[in-house]
Amino acid sequence: MNYLISSLPFPNNFLNSSHSPFVFGLICGSLLGTSMNVGSFISLRRLIIQGIPAGVVSYLGSAISETFFLFLILFGYIGVIEKWFTLEPSLTFIITVFCADTIIGFLLDNRLKIVSLSQTTDLLKIFLCNAVIVFGNPGSTWGATSLITSIEGFQFRENSLFLFGVFLGIFVIGCGIGFLILALTNLWMIQSSKTFRSLIYRSNKIISHLALCILILSTIYYHWQVYIGLSLSTSSMPMITITKHDREPFYTDDESQMSWNRYKNKVERKNQPHPMKTLGGLPIKQFGQWFKKNVITSNPEDLDARGLPRERTKTGDYVPNYETMQAIRNKKWFSRSKNYLYIKEKIFSLLSINPMKVKFLEHSRRDMDLFYLGDKKSTRITITEMSKSDYNQMLENRKQRIQNIINRRN
């Protein structure tokens, strides 16, 4: 659909003119109405087996549901969309089970059951059934969203007219295809000697199997991570009022990708456990593994975590690398950690609460010595709170100690 809409024979200037949002919405809705998804097959089955009122109401539920999802996108209701993102994995599973149950019910019950206009309760159930299926099925909602938001040169100047055109296109074309198939089956009945029962049985079986195949394929292919085209940074306000970018398209690939990455990283940092998620209670063994991998190079300089050289051992003298010492002392080794952002935010938040208080990792030289980092009996890092002046004084004392070591070796 995306390639088809981009290859339309009329220029973008016509599509982008102030007099064409309704026409353009009608064209897009017509293309969406021809898509084959679970909702369209269920509506077609209801039209043939349960009668015209049931089929029309089912198509109406699909059209309203797809238009409502586009309404949330185009008018910037990002808060609702974020909640939909959060519920999408569970929602997809529930909708998939509901669709499978509905389709299996169609296969088991192939009798003709006409629903009349007086049966308002049954019609309402049919309407809600298709509306929920389409809204919760990524194959339907994402197909509509990716088609509309991938069009170049259209600025959605009048969203209401555009959405009305989309709704009419989806509903009219969907019903038109259903009535066309119904007319062809009627013509086939007249021309052949088959009984009406055999027609109902075969039509129900074919449509139900096709719907089940589409459901399985969409469940395998679509998942919540495919929604990378949605710009989560858009403010909750109608797009018609946004003039900062001089009516550019709804989003660009770079903008949407960056927005999604920020959202994804936020969710991952919130939900996934990290070995260095807290500054206190960090096992020495984990820190030692990280320290050996990220700080010590192929030509290791034996330093403890405070940036001081180790003492001589029986294997020989160890020459300290003072650039590495300086980097460790300035806490630059945090930048090599995969949890650098989390630790940095944690430290900044602590400083912002009380600028006169900082968190500092205090440990013994033996605990942080590389020779003992793999020892399971090593103690854990503890956190002590000190004032900012004491912390600065401690740094000055450390500089002086390093300078004294350099002077003694020289």
UniProtKB/Swiss-Prot annotation:
Gene Ontology process terms (BP): protein transport
Protein family (similarity comment): Belongs to the TIC214 family.
The record's subcellular location field reads: Plastid, Chloroplast inner membrane
Tell me where the transmembrane regions lie.
22-42, 61-81, 87-107, 131-151, 161-181, 210-230
Q: What is its main location?
A: plastid
Its job: Involved in protein precursor import into chloroplasts. May be part of an intermediate translocation complex acting as a protein-conducting channel at the inner envelope.
Q: Does the keyword Transport apply?
A: yes
What membrane topology is annotated for this entry?
A: Multi-pass membrane protein
Q: Has keyword Protein transport?
A: yes
Q: What is this protein called?
A: Protein TIC 214
